[in-house]
């Protein structure tokens, strides 16, 4: 395995900024490792051990770093958790994803929309109209049950299976059109497919004449923060299903990165 080295940029404006960059490199390396000694961090950031130790002592005083379970070992502190949590709670789904929604609309020429989960419902909170007229007739602020349509199912799929059980215990699955899944078992199959592929597709199961491709936007914990989707004609979807799915998947991954999602650091809750 190749060892990752956390090195500051070669050129920095002044000594003060250089110190900040080096300190950040130490924090980044410690977060990546989980815990480490001063010597291990010094090797990772390519700095003298004595300098790294002084940084750690300063960070410890700010509660950004704390002593680990073994002597001489450091780990991220509660202050770092508080700081990160404070930043994340200020991330608004609409604001963070807007650049992604705009690019997706420009690429597909289709109407794109954003939805979030509120209880057992998916709430549509943003829509950017495309060049074509077809669209789901759901107003901003409108809702759909979580098993109905591509975006709602994208949100439900990335909840724990225990939530699926809770949802279906409280919900009666009835098809909205003749092309919709007809029972709980059929919906669960679609959820498992979405969980495996990262994409949810509705082919006329909400409104006849309208298909939708959606994908979940995940946060730093791997939780579904929102669902990005676009509408298109069913025949257009069926002509190149894989390419349309990849566009939704790529857009959602871009938005997920903006929420701090990193696949290598997230463990499954399923």
Regions found by a protein language model. Give the residues of each.
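N-terminal helix-turn-helix
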Residues: 1-95, 253-261
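A structural signal for short hydrophobic beta-strand segments in well-ordered beta-sheet cores
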Residues: 65-67, 114-115, 217
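Short, solvent-exposed cationic patches
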Residues: 146-149, 165, 242-262
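Short, highly charged C-terminal tails/helix-capping segments
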Residues: 261-270
């Amino acid at each position: 395995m190749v060892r990752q080295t956390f090195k500051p940029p070669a050129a920095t404006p002044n000594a003060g900024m250089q110190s900040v960059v080096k300190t950040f490199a130490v924090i980044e390396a410690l977060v990546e490792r989980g815990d480490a000694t001063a010597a291990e961090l010094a090797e990772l950031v390519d700095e003298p051990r004595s300098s790294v130790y002084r940084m750690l002592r300063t960070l410890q005083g700010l509660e950004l770093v704390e002593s680990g379970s073994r002597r001489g070992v450091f780990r991220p502190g509660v202050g770092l958790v508080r700081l990160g949590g404070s930043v994340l709670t200020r991330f608004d789904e609409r604001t963070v994803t807007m650049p992604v929604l705009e690019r997706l609309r420009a690429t597909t020429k289709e109407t794109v929309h954003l939805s979030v989960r509120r209880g057992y419902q998916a709430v549509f909170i943003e829509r950017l109209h495309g060049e074509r007229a077809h669209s789901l007739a759901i107003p901003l602020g409108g809702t759909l049950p979580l098993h109905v349509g591509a975006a709602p199912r994208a949100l439900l799929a990335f909840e724990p299976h225990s939530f699926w059980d809770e949802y279906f215990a409280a919900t009666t699955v009835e098809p909205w059109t003749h092309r919709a899944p007809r029972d709980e078992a059929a919906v669960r199959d679609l959820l498992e497919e979405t969980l495996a592929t990262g994409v949810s597709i509705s082919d006329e199961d909400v409104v006849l004449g309208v298909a939708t491709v959606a994908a979940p936007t995940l946060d730093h914990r791997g939780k579904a923060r929102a669902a990005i989707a676009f509408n298109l004609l069913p025949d257009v979807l069926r002509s190149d299903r894989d390419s349309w799915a990849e566009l939704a998947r790529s857009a959602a991954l871009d938005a997920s990165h903006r929420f701090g999602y990193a696949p290598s650091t997230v463990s499954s809750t399923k």
